[in-house]
């Protein structure tokens, strides 16, 4: 489905954001991407659909090398990739419905897009997705009037408007409170299973990642240092990904053994991971 071979990204400063990343994602597979800030997680996701141009390597989606496509062919290939952003990437002055329908722009010609003319089928799909993500009746509300959780739900529905094969999800819970974060994660994974989608989800919360995602890939300094089941994440793996630290409060939360007196320490440790 998705095959990444020797993916590298270097900047003009000489900094290397990605160092020979090799990764495969099977149809319907859900993968969590974790690592410290600056590890290359967002860069990796953006290199897949070439929002960031890779310096070297191959990115194969259903056998087609995205890294070497011309502009027109890349536009066609991007139809199959849905993107969900940390900061939602909504047009604030537009309504929820208008933001959703923008997910169909890759299938529309210039003039229909310019005049915002969409097919009855697209409009029906938009209403159905709004209902599915819990925003029924909010189609005429402006994006800037929504809460953070509601905006993320619009972003999720917009990505599904593309009818993609693959979802790239970049920090979907970073700006959300713990309850909303769990709701959003459940929603994303439920929709992936309902639509048979594969997903790469960049997420800073290790406990949330291991709770919801069966496979975890850990990046450090642009290189993959762990690729395996969430159930195998322990203090040794966390040290390999993030560096030396007392990870007991995190691993206790992952295994459900945190006692009430340890909850504050666990929260502090989680914040420390996100800040690194």
Curated annotation (Swiss-Prot):
Report the protein name in the record: Phosphonates import ATP-binding protein PhnC
Family that this chain belongs to: Belongs to the ABC transporter superfamily. Phosphonates importer (TC 3.A.1.9.1) family.
Catalytic reactions on record: phosphonate(out) + ATP + H2O = phosphonate(in) + ADP + phosphate + H(+)
CDD domains recorded: ABC_PhnC_transporter
Q: Name one GO molecular function term.
A: ABC-type phosphonate transporter activity
What the protein does comes down to: Part of the ABC transporter complex PhnCDE involved in phosphonates import. Responsible for energy coupling to the transport system.
Provide the leader sequence positions: none
Q: Which InterPro entries match?
A: AAA+_ATPase, ABC_transporter-like_ATP-bd, ABC_transporter-like_CS, ABC_transpr_PhnC, MetN_ABC_transporter-like, P-loop_NTPase
Q: Where does ATP bind?
A: 35-42
* Record's subcellular location: Cell inner membrane
What's one Pfam family here?
ABC_tran
Note the topology in the membrane. Peripheral membrane protein
Which GO CC annotations does the UniProt entry carry? plasma membrane
Q: What class of enzyme is it?
A: translocase
Assembly and interactions? The complex is composed of two ATP-binding proteins (PhnC), two transmembrane proteins (PhnE) and a solute-binding protein (PhnD).
Mostly located where? membrane
Q: Which UniProt keywords apply?
A: ATP-binding, Cell inner membrane, Cell membrane, Membrane, Nucleotide-binding, Phosphonate transport, Translocase, Transport
State which Enzyme Commission number(s) the record gives.
7.3.2.2
Q: Where is the ABC transporter domain?
A: 2-246
């Amino acid at each position: 489905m998705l095959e990444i071979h020797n993916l590298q990204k270097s900047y003009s400063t000489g900094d290397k954001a990605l160092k020979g990343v090799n990764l495969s994602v099977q149809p319907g597979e859900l993968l969590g991407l974790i690592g410290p800030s600056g590890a290359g997680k967002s860069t990796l996701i953006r290199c897949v659909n070439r929002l960031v141009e890779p310096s070297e390597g191959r990115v194969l989606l259903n056998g087609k090398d995205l890294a070497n496509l011309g502009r027109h062919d890349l536009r066609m290939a991007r139809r199959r990739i849905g993107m969900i952003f940390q900061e939602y990437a909504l047009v604030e002055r537009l309504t929820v419905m208008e933001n959703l329908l923008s997910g169909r722009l890759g299938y529309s010609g210039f003039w229909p897009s310019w005049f915002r003319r969409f097919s009855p089928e697209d409009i029906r799909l938009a209403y159905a997705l709004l209902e599915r993500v819990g925003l029924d009746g909010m189609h005429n509300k402006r994006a800037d009037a929504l809460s953070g959780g509601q905006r993320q739900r619009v972003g999720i529905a917009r990505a599904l408007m593309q009818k993609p094969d693959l979802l790239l999800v970049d920090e979907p819970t970073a700006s959300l409170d713990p309850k909303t974060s769990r709701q959003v994660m459940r929603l994303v994974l439920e929709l992936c299973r309902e639509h048979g989608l594969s997903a790469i989800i960049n997420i800073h919360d290790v406990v949330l990642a291991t709770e919801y995602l069966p496979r975890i890939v850990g990046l450090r300094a642009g290189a993959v240092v762990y690729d395996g089941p969430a159930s195998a994440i322990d203090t040794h793996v966390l040290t390999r990904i993030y560096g030396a630290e007392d990870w007991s409060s995190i691993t206790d939360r992952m295994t459900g053994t945190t006692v009430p007196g340890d909850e504050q320490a666990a929260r502090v440790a989680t914040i420390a991971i996100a800040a690194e």
